[in-house]
């Protein structure tokens, strides 16, 4: 979700400091310590990495899990992080929440409070993988990479990450939306997201919720990311509005990820609990996805690394995370892949 503004008449909030792709513009008096987007391999000991194709297969999803994803448009219950990894990421999250972080200007977007409701707070930022070692290495999680390969059906690249923080008792909502409605500046639609809570997630503290089967509804218009939780209902038919009444709540322990399709309708309610609800989203694309930047407004006025029309997403800001030929070799034939007919293709929606 979230990205540069598309020519729809709506605008997206812009970061406080603007730069063209490949350029860093710093606020006065600040210096960049290190732009980690230049490093396309793990730089910490956050994960133990497989050393052979056999070790990679230990992370493989089952055929039943793939079928569940195809039917519902999401797949919960994939362990990404353990206790020590969670603590390291929470410590780094606390650091980058500070607007005075020396590398703050590297964020693609940085919103201390994107909530529209009075008295609510929703921290939201994109591009944290460039700032701190563990945040940088999270997309290289072996469990995440293997699942992404199976669900996307090919080599995997990082699209962008997101941070969401809902503070206790007054955390704001994220309204029902589809991610790809914000991403039509890339094509074809071969995208995937993994939502990873850093705290135990429940309905009470605003866990992510999904509408099963909504990835088959086609592309819906943008109706807003915050504010009215049910704003998207205006774009739905009666059957679809009825489905909003019975969402699936992804109540998962900290560190357990939920993967979802780019057309799956999802959102999260307020955090009314006494606990924080912190989460990281890793958004991915299959290798070969291209820029469709001509549909964007004001391409030069934000920090998001937009590539020229028709250019394949690659280079500094879109690192290759996993390639089956190099990691699996001949054993790739043993790994089941998701069927590619669970949702309409971009030219059908």
Enumerate the language-model features and the residues they cover:
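Double-stranded beta-helix
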Residues: 49, 201-265, 289
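Conserved hydrophobic/aromatic beta-strand scaffold that supports enzyme active sites
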Residues: 58, 74-76, 193-197, 247-249, ...
């Amino acid at each position: 979700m979230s990205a540069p503004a598309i020519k729809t008449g709506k605008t997206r909030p812009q970061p406080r400091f603007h730069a063209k792709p490949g350029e860093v513009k710093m606020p006065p008096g600040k210096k960049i310590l290190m732009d980690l987007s230049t490093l396309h391999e793990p730089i910490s000991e956050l994960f133990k990495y497989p050393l052979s194709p056999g070790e990679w297969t230990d992370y493989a999803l089952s055929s039943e899990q793939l079928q569940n994803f195809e039917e519902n448009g999401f797949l919960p219950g994939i362990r990404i992080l353990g206790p020590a990894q969670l603590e390291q990421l929470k410590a780094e999250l606390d650091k980058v929440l500070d607007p005075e972080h020396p590398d703050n200007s590297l964020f693609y977007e940085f919103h201390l409070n994107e909530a529209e409701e009075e008295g609510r707070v929703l921290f939201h930022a994109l591009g944290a993988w460039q700032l701190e070692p563990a945040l940088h290495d999270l997309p290289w999680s072996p469990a995440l990479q293997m699942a992404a390969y199976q669900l996307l059906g090919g080599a995997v690249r990082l699209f962008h990450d997101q941070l969401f923080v809902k503070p206790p008792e007054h955390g704001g909502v994220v309204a029902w939306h589809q991610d790809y409605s914000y991403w039509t500046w890339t094509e074809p639609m071969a995208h995937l997201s993994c939502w990873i809570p850093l705290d135990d997630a429940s309905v009470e503290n605003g866990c992510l919720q999904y509408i099963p089967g909504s990835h088959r509804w086609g592309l819906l218009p943008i109706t807003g990311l915050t504010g009215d939780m049910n704003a998207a209902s205006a774009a739905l038919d009666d059957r679809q509005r009825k489905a909003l009444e019975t969402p699936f709540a992804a109540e998962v322990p900290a560190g357990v990820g939920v993967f979802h399709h780019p057309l799956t309708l999802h959102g999260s309610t307020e955090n009314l609990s006494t606990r924080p609800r912190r989460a990281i989203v890793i958004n991915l694309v299959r290798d070969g996805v291209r820029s469709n930047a001509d549909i964007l407004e004001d391409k030069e006025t934000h920090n998001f690394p937009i590539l020229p029309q028709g250019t394949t997403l690659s280079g500094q800001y879109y690192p290759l995370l996993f390639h089956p030929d190099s990691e699996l070799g001949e054993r790739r034939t043993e790994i089941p892949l998701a069927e590619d007919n669970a949702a309409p293709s971009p030219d059908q929606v």
